[in-house]
Amino acid sequence: MEDIPRFANDYMAEDLELVKSGCIEVAARLNDLLDNILLVGGAVPALLIDHHQKLDIATDRSDPLSAHVGTRDLDLGLAVGVLNKRRYSEISTRLKESGFKPDENASGNQTTHRWKHCDAEKLTIDFLIAPVEKEETGGNIRNLESDFSAIVVPGLDLALEDPHPIQLSGTALDGSEMSIEIPVCGPGGFVLLKALACQKRGKDKDKYDLFYVLRNYEKGPERVAHSFRPFLERGAAEAEQAVDIMEEYFDDSNSRGPRAVSNFLYGHQDDTVEADAAAFVQAFLRAL
């Protein structure tokens, strides 16, 4: 049975380091295709904030509000442009050559939207793709090849418009040392995707990730709102839905969002954290 982390202390520093190595490996292998790829998901706060803003997460990981807990997964968002000229075929071929292959579920069947590395089996890559058509349902699987697919994620097309290049140095999965630029989801796109995820799935970590970015990105909620506002100005339905979700989930400190944050962090209610979570989200919403 898959070991799914539920609380902050389930995440280890070595998990994040492995994900960083995976980022470097994938970026090096797909370097000329990165204009159609964006790093999204739980690795974003650690790179966009902790790494890019030069926070020293190595010295103190005891405070999950000041140093992101990290992730075990590498989520790659694919633009619909990969469907042109069969770029998806080039992506899968290169990843296979570097040691990645489709994962298997508990029944032994391939999960073609999730791949793992032959030498680092704790690391998985989840492939996501923006909807090709507006009516395409989120969560559906878009098959690209017989052993390669991606989960349809509404709003990903918006996030792909605001990549933040992050220079990452370290050891790739093949053991080589390098420094390479990673296209990372911007704060506005990240909050949009996380807000939608809050409603779609019941993971407490989604609420924590959202709160962490609003609390720690540069000058805080107002700066994130500046990155998010263009989505609303163009009338993007996903952005409006994300706002509605945040208003509902973080209405006050007793709402489900703040409760989920404190439960993820400590396994119980914490009045201070819950008040902060509601306050930061409300400050973001007011700044819009």
Language-model regions: role of each:
Residues 1-288:
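Compositionally biased terminal segments of proteins
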